[in-house]
Amino acid sequence: MGQKVNPFGFRLGITTDHRSRWFADSTKTGQRYADYVKEDVAIRRLMSKGMERAGISKVEIERTRDRVRVDIHTARPGIVIGRRGAEADRIRTELEKLTGKQVQLNILEVKNPEVDAQLVAQGVAEQLASRVSFRRAMRKGMQTTMRSGAKGIRVQCAGRLGGAEMSRSEFYREGRVPLHTLRANIDYGFYEARTTFGRIGVKVWIYHGDITSRELAQSQAAAPRAPRRNERGDRPDRGARRTRPAQDTTAPVAEAVATGSAPTGTAATEPVIGKGSNGTEA
């Protein structure tokens, strides 16, 4: 499971958070859930088009009623901003034309790009496009990441490696990369290298260490709590049905059959009338 699933979606709410934050319950055209998802994809494609040299790590989108906030995390903010902010103004204008709303553009710098999985994958892909041996490019990226403080890294390349006729995939791993551990802080990145032999996909997993129990408790406290069974409004509480009356654990007192007078200390009871085997009353 952990080997196949996307590490971000696998750890949502534990070590990762959504990169698109908005709410949609309207049925109007342009405000539906599908419309917002399509618009987010278009925004991210616009950011990646023509911005390869900027080293964009991720794009976060947050929506309000009449405004869209776009946070661009980049290793080279100067390229995104441009001279006197000309490039940033151009991006903001295109985003407002795409969304039809006021756009707040924030450009954030990635402090340590050597341990960012998306930037590492992009660096390996650029070397493959420059005809560097895929094994050399993978090992160079791994060594740089491990020297920068990462606890583990795994790099995988798939495609016509080395110009071979048959496509295959190879990966190298250094350190520890626990993909099944949910508390593990795993960063994941993917990038495609366009070579003369076709496209080669590059995937990178970087392990930054486990989050502490204190951080895990804080993240769980911040997450919305699921309603309990007795708090649900769609069905009544059925707890009273399951409760049973307490049983008397004292030994039963044998009833005395009154033949003439009741024994001392006990009340007189009615005589027990039974039937014999022939049907006559005793």
UniProtKB/Swiss-Prot annotation:
Which residue stretches does the UniProt record annotate as biased composition, category Low complexity? 256-269
State if Ribonucleoprotein is listed as a keyword. yes
**What InterPro entries does the database record attribute to this sequence?**
KH_dom, KH_dom-like_a/b, KH_dom_type_2, KH_sf_prok-type, Ribosomal_S3_C_sf, Ribosomal_uS3_bac-typ, Ribosomal_uS3_C, Ribosomal_uS3_CS
Domain (KH type-2): give its ranges. 43-111
- Chain intervals for the UniProt region annotation (Disordered): 217-282
Q: GO CC terms for this protein?
A: cytosolic small ribosomal subunit
Q: Which GO terms describe its molecular function?
A: mRNA binding; rRNA binding; structural constituent of ribosome
- Which controlled-vocabulary keywords does the entry list? Ribonucleoprotein, Ribosomal protein, RNA-binding, rRNA-binding
SUPFAM superfamilies from the entry?
Prokaryotic type KH domain (KH-domain type II) (SSF54814), Ribosomal protein S3 C-terminal domain (SSF54821)
Biased composition annotated in UniProt, kind: Basic and acidic residues: 228-240
- Do the record's keywords include NADP? no
GO BP, one annotated term = translation
How does this protein assemble? Part of the 30S ribosomal subunit. Forms a tight complex with proteins S10 and S14.
User: What's the family?
Assistant: Belongs to the universal ribosomal protein uS3 family.
Q: What does this protein do?
A: Binds the lower part of the 30S subunit head. Binds mRNA in the 70S ribosome, positioning it for translation.
Supply the name of the protein: Small ribosomal subunit protein uS3
Q: Which organism is it from?
A: Kineococcus radiotolerans (strain ATCC BAA-149 / DSM 14245 / SRS30216)
